[in-house]
Amino acid sequence: MHKIVFVTGNKGKFAEVRDILKNFGIEAIQNKDGYPELQEDELEPIAANGAQYVANKLNMPVMVDDSGIFINALNGFPGPYSRFVEDKLGNPKVLKLMEGEKDRSAYFKTVIGYCEPGQEPLVFPGVVEGKIAYEERGTGGFGYDPIFEYNGMTFGELGDEEKNKVSHRRRAVDNFLEWFIGGA
Protein backbone atom coordinates (compact mmCIF):
# COMPACT_ATOMS: atom_id res chain seq x y z
CA MET A 1 0.00 0.00 0.00
CA HIS A 2 1.29 3.47 -0.93
CA LYS A 3 1.58 5.98 1.90
CA ILE A 4 1.22 9.71 1.40
CA VAL A 5 1.45 12.36 4.09
CA PHE A 6 -1.51 14.74 3.86
CA VAL A 7 -0.72 18.04 5.55
CA THR A 8 -3.75 19.67 7.15
CA GLY A 9 -5.04 20.54 10.57
CA ASN A 10 -8.60 20.44 9.21
CA LYS A 11 -10.33 17.21 10.30
CA GLY A 12 -12.98 17.55 7.59
CA LYS A 13 -10.47 17.91 4.78
CA PHE A 14 -8.42 15.00 6.06
CA ALA A 15 -11.42 12.68 6.39
CA GLU A 16 -12.63 13.54 2.88
CA VAL A 17 -9.25 12.90 1.26
CA ARG A 18 -8.45 9.83 3.39
CA ASP A 19 -11.74 8.19 2.42
CA ILE A 20 -11.16 8.80 -1.29
CA LEU A 21 -7.55 7.59 -1.28
CA LYS A 22 -8.19 4.40 0.69
CA ASN A 23 -10.44 3.17 -2.13
CA PHE A 24 -7.34 3.20 -4.33
CA GLY A 25 -5.01 1.42 -1.93
CA ILE A 26 -3.36 4.62 -0.71
CA GLU A 27 -3.00 5.31 2.99
CA ALA A 28 -3.17 8.98 3.94
CA ILE A 29 -1.19 9.91 7.03
CA GLN A 30 -2.24 13.18 8.60
CA ASN A 31 0.40 15.75 9.47
CA LYS A 32 -0.83 18.84 11.32
CA ASP A 33 2.50 20.68 11.44
CA GLY A 34 1.67 22.99 8.55
CA TYR A 35 4.14 24.87 6.39
CA PRO A 36 5.11 28.46 5.58
CA GLU A 37 2.28 29.61 3.33
CA LEU A 38 3.02 31.95 0.45
CA GLN A 39 0.78 35.00 0.19
CA GLU A 40 -0.41 34.67 -3.39
CA ASP A 41 -3.54 35.53 -5.34
CA GLU A 42 -3.61 32.03 -6.89
CA LEU A 43 -3.93 28.67 -5.15
CA GLU A 44 -1.47 26.75 -7.37
CA PRO A 45 1.80 28.29 -6.12
CA ILE A 46 0.65 28.02 -2.51
CA ALA A 47 -0.07 24.29 -2.85
CA ALA A 48 3.10 23.60 -4.86
CA ASN A 49 5.37 25.42 -2.42
CA GLY A 50 3.77 23.77 0.62
CA ALA A 51 4.04 20.27 -0.83
CA GLN A 52 7.69 20.72 -1.78
CA TYR A 53 8.62 22.23 1.58
CA VAL A 54 7.07 19.41 3.62
CA ALA A 55 8.22 16.60 1.28
CA ASN A 56 11.82 17.73 1.67
CA LYS A 57 11.43 18.28 5.42
CA LEU A 58 9.87 14.84 6.10
CA ASN A 59 11.62 12.97 3.27
CA MET A 60 8.29 11.41 2.30
CA PRO A 61 5.71 11.88 -0.48
CA VAL A 62 3.43 14.72 0.55
CA MET A 63 0.06 16.04 -0.50
CA VAL A 64 -1.30 19.43 0.51
CA ASP A 65 -4.62 21.06 -0.29
CA ASP A 66 -5.22 24.73 -0.77
CA SER A 67 -8.84 25.66 -1.33
CA GLY A 68 -10.96 28.72 -1.68
CA ILE A 69 -14.40 29.96 -2.52
CA PHE A 70 -14.50 32.51 -5.32
CA ILE A 71 -17.59 34.74 -5.42
CA ASN A 72 -18.06 36.35 -8.81
CA ALA A 73 -20.02 39.42 -7.59
CA LEU A 74 -17.13 40.14 -5.21
CA ASN A 75 -14.47 39.83 -7.95
CA GLY A 76 -13.39 36.39 -6.74
CA PHE A 77 -13.22 37.36 -3.05
CA PRO A 78 -12.28 35.70 -0.75
CA GLY A 79 -10.40 33.29 -3.06
CA PRO A 80 -7.06 32.18 -1.59
CA TYR A 81 -7.84 34.16 1.56
CA SER A 82 -10.92 32.05 2.33
CA ARG A 83 -9.64 30.56 5.57
CA PHE A 84 -8.64 33.97 6.92
CA VAL A 85 -12.01 35.47 5.94
CA GLU A 86 -13.87 32.52 7.46
CA ASP A 87 -11.95 32.92 10.72
CA LYS A 88 -12.37 36.71 10.88
CA LEU A 89 -15.81 37.26 9.32
CA GLY A 90 -17.61 33.94 9.09
CA ASN A 91 -20.53 33.02 6.87
CA PRO A 92 -22.99 35.60 8.29
CA LYS A 93 -20.76 38.51 7.23
CA VAL A 94 -20.10 36.97 3.82
CA LEU A 95 -23.87 36.75 3.36
CA LYS A 96 -24.12 40.40 4.46
CA LEU A 97 -21.60 41.36 1.75
CA MET A 98 -23.87 39.61 -0.76
CA GLU A 99 -27.04 41.49 0.24
CA GLY A 100 -28.65 43.01 -2.83
CA GLU A 101 -26.40 41.13 -5.26
CA LYS A 102 -28.26 39.58 -8.17
CA ASP A 103 -25.27 37.58 -9.38
CA ARG A 104 -24.84 34.90 -6.73
CA SER A 105 -22.61 32.65 -8.84
CA ALA A 106 -19.52 31.28 -7.17
CA TYR A 107 -17.16 28.37 -7.33
CA PHE A 108 -15.12 26.33 -4.94
CA LYS A 109 -11.62 25.46 -6.09
CA THR A 110 -9.13 23.07 -4.57
CA VAL A 111 -5.58 22.63 -5.74
CA ILE A 112 -3.80 19.50 -4.57
CA GLY A 113 -0.05 19.94 -4.41
CA TYR A 114 1.94 16.70 -4.52
CA CYS A 115 5.68 16.33 -4.15
CA GLU A 116 8.21 13.60 -3.53
CA PRO A 117 11.46 14.46 -1.75
CA GLY A 118 13.97 16.21 -4.00
CA GLN A 119 11.48 16.51 -6.86
CA GLU A 120 9.52 19.38 -8.38
CA PRO A 121 5.93 19.67 -7.11
CA LEU A 122 2.89 18.93 -9.23
CA VAL A 123 -0.53 20.55 -8.90
CA PHE A 124 -3.98 19.12 -9.56
CA PRO A 125 -6.95 21.52 -9.58
CA GLY A 126 -10.61 20.73 -9.04
CA VAL A 127 -13.54 23.13 -9.40
CA VAL A 128 -17.24 22.93 -8.64
CA GLU A 129 -19.64 25.68 -9.78
CA GLY A 130 -22.55 26.82 -7.68
CA LYS A 131 -23.97 29.90 -6.06
CA ILE A 132 -24.16 31.65 -2.73
CA ALA A 133 -27.36 30.87 -0.83
CA TYR A 134 -29.38 33.65 0.81
CA GLU A 135 -28.95 32.09 4.24
CA GLU A 136 -26.99 29.32 5.93
CA ARG A 137 -28.64 25.94 5.38
CA GLY A 138 -27.63 22.55 6.71
CA THR A 139 -25.38 21.40 9.48
CA GLY A 140 -23.04 19.12 7.53
CA GLY A 141 -19.61 19.83 6.21
CA PHE A 142 -17.42 22.69 7.36
CA GLY A 143 -16.39 26.21 6.40
CA TYR A 144 -18.50 27.71 3.64
CA ASP A 145 -20.51 24.51 3.04
CA PRO A 146 -23.75 25.91 4.58
CA ILE A 147 -23.79 28.87 2.14
CA PHE A 148 -22.53 27.20 -1.06
CA GLU A 149 -25.45 25.93 -3.10
CA TYR A 150 -25.00 23.16 -5.66
CA ASN A 151 -27.99 21.87 -7.63
CA GLY A 152 -30.48 23.42 -5.22
CA MET A 153 -28.91 22.22 -1.97
CA THR A 154 -26.05 23.63 0.04
CA PHE A 155 -23.03 21.45 0.69
CA GLY A 156 -24.12 21.67 4.33
CA GLU A 157 -27.41 19.99 3.41
CA LEU A 158 -25.95 17.29 1.16
CA GLY A 159 -24.20 15.26 3.84
CA ASP A 160 -20.61 14.13 3.59
CA GLU A 161 -21.16 11.09 1.39
CA GLU A 162 -23.08 12.99 -1.31
CA LYS A 163 -20.85 16.07 -1.10
CA ASN A 164 -17.72 13.96 -1.41
CA LYS A 165 -18.96 12.59 -4.75
CA VAL A 166 -19.14 16.05 -6.37
CA SER A 167 -16.92 18.40 -4.38
CA HIS A 168 -14.03 20.48 -5.67
CA ARG A 169 -11.72 18.48 -3.42
CA ARG A 170 -13.01 15.22 -4.91
CA ARG A 171 -12.36 16.53 -8.40
CA ALA A 172 -8.82 17.63 -7.50
CA VAL A 173 -8.06 14.28 -5.84
CA ASP A 174 -9.51 12.46 -8.88
CA ASN A 175 -7.14 14.46 -11.12
CA PHE A 176 -4.25 13.50 -8.85
CA LEU A 177 -5.29 9.82 -8.86
CA GLU A 178 -5.56 9.77 -12.65
CA TRP A 179 -1.92 10.87 -12.80
CA PHE A 180 -0.69 8.81 -9.83
CA ILE A 181 -2.30 5.53 -10.83
CA GLY A 182 -1.59 6.07 -14.51
CA GLY A 183 2.08 6.72 -13.75
CA ALA A 184 2.53 4.27 -10.86
From Swiss-Prot:
Highest taxon listed in the record's lineage: Archaea
Residues noted as binding Mg(2+) in the record, renumbered to the chain: 37, 66
Cofactor: Mg(2+)
HAMAP family per UniProt: Non_canon_purine_NTPase
CDD domains listed in its UniProt record: HAM1 (cd00515)
Gene3D superfamilies from the UniProt entry: 3.90.950.10
Name used for this protein in its record: dITP/XTP pyrophosphatase
InterPro entries named in the record: dITP/XTP_pyrophosphatase, ITPase-like_fam, RdgB/HAM1
Origin species: Methanosarcina mazei (strain ATCC BAA-159 / DSM 3647 / Goe1 / Go1 / JCM 11833 / OCM 88) (Methanosarcina frisia)
One Pfam family matching this protein: Ham1p_like
